[in-house]
Amino acid sequence: KPVYKEKLRLRTYGQCAVDNSPAFLEIKKKFRGITYKRRFELTYKELHNYITDGTPPDKRGQVFEEIDYMIRRMSLKPKIVICYDREAYYGKDDKEFRLTFDGNVRFRRDDLDLRAGDHGEYLITQPYTIMEVKSAGAIPIWLARTLSEKKIFHGSFSKYGNIFANEIRQKYKVGV
């Protein structure tokens, strides 16, 4: 695995973005197993205008400038939309603890405007679900015991990485 990884994500929540929906530009960096995430909030209309014609939002800050520099330096353009149905749970006593379940993961490489809805080709369907556990420290002992009893063990899964790997397999007919 690489020591350093960096990705840019454009994100909205809900089934279909509208012009005044909250939207986020996020930089996610992973260095030696530690993930750092910085995000900038704007409306979907501002995000769409910025991505399509370079018009920056009225309100900017350090995080936006960092993202803007990254986009310009690397000539980044949106390439894929990934949608999923998420259930998220937060710790009652530990606000740093979060448990999420992502199901019905779908994607599309055309029609990249998020106002077009959450349609796409399925990557994962029921009964399969991605479970993610996030915690600033050790996970709660009750969860560790439950996962162990159910023989659920740590693994990694990248939605984008798996879409890309599937496309490569299809292209070269490897393992199909």
What are these regions (language model features)?
Residues 1-176:
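Phosphate-end processing signature that detects enzymes handling 5′-triphosphorylated RNA
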